[in-house]
Design a protein with these regions (language model features):
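A conserved regulatory-domain signal marking ACT and ACT-like small-molecule sensing domains
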Residues: 1-111
Length: 111
């Protein structure tokens, strides 16, 4: 089953390496990874998407919670949530092609 795990962690050098290293040590694949600082400059939010059985995910979350840098961990797939994808595309088109591309983009509410 696919899981989305949100990790609030200390914004320090090596913190990301320790979290990702835990996945690597357990021979566990990370499908997506996103890291960004929070409003509090001392903290970062790491969002990881991975696939695994519930008991394996539970084991990984227990190990993650033991890391010194991890402040809070939430498995977002346990509750109701909204998922979105983002794609950046650069297109060079003129005239009729440009209009057709805009119409296609409008179908998907692209900007």
């Amino acid at each position: 089953m696919r899981h989305i795990i949100s990790i609030l962690m200390e914004n320090e050098p090596g913190a990301l390496s320790r979290v990702v290293g835990l996945f690597s040590q357990r021979n566990f694949n990370i499908e997506t990874l996103n890291v960004a600082p929070t409003e509090d400059a001392t903290l970062s939010r790491l969002t990881v998407t991975t696939v695994g059985e519930d008991r394996v995910i539970e084991q990984i979350t227990k190990h993650l919670n033991k890391l010194v840098d991890v402040v809070k961990l939430v498995d977002l797939t346990e509750g109701s949530h909204i998922e979105r994808e983002l794609m950046l595309v650069k297109v060079k088109a003129l005239g009729a092609q440009r209009d057709e591309i805009k119409r296609t983009a409008d179908i998907f509410r692209a900007q």
